[in-house]
Amino acid sequence: MPVSQSRARARDRNNVLNRAEFLSLNQPPKGTQEPRSSGRKASGPSTQPPPSSDGARERRQSQQLPEEDCMQLNPSFKGIAFNSLLAIDICMSKRLGVCAGRAASWASARSMVKLIGITSHGIPWIGGTILCLVRSSTLAGQEVLMNLLLALLLDIMTVAGVQKLIKRRGPYETSPGLLDYLTMDIYAFPAGHASRAAMVSKFFLSHLVLAVPLRVLLVLWAFCVGLSRVMIGRHHITDVISGFIIGYFQFRLVELVWMSSNTCQMLISAW
């Protein structure tokens, strides 16, 4: 036993690492355990921050976007062209609206310009046509007037239906008048005064024998009616152009369903 103890002491003495100045080499550094454990903790799944609810909601909404919204991010050539024409239409209509308000450059001429538009209103034309129909004594005159009355009623119903469907506002905030409410001419597209002026002008040029100066004046009247509606800020330029086109097709439709003299006499007698 003493021999074994002496051998163990000699072995420890011979081992250089057991000396006091080398004991620190056998022990791991004090700061190494914590970084490893902290790194191990950081790499673990339990320490990952939970995803924010806002980010998850945005990703969910982006996955549920309809195709129309995705297509708006990459508009087609037709969409770009349409938006460009629409912007030009609004800009030009606002520039031509020189009588749109009291502070406009031509505000003093607003009453006169508005009077030009009233010459193509539906109520005066329907009332005047009925009055002429009552006083007419010829079959040919009654036939023309009855078909003109049909065309005017068709124009009012067509314009009111399209305006109710489109519901486009004018370039300026202008409230419709009492006569506009009676004819349901509330919105901007299409321009009812312009369609009526075009239809009546074409009707008179086709069924009345007029001199050349009167024909020119009739065409100028229709053009001035459309321009007056833009000047007072009631319609856009495209509204007036569309009104002219609709008025022409209304005339063509009345020509197709033209009522004969016998039909007109039957309706007059029933009335």
From Swiss-Prot:
Residue segments, region Disordered: 1-69
Membrane topology designation: Multi-pass membrane protein
Extracellular side: 134-141, 224-239
PTM annotation (Phosphoserine): residues: 43, 62
Keyword Manganese: no
Residue span of region Interaction with MTOR: 70-91
Cell location: Nucleus envelope; Endoplasmic reticulum membrane; Membrane
Covalent S-S links between cysteines: none
Entry GO terms, CC: endoplasmic reticulum membrane; membrane; nuclear envelope
Quaternary structure annotation from Swiss-Prot or TrEMBL: Homo- and heterooligomer. Interacts with MTOR; controls MTOR-dependent IGF2 expression during myoblast differentiation.
Family membership: Belongs to the PA-phosphatase related phosphoesterase family.
Protein name: Inactive phospholipid phosphatase 7
Naturally occurring in which organism (per UniProt): Rattus norvegicus
Gene name, Swiss-Prot/TrEMBL: Plpp7
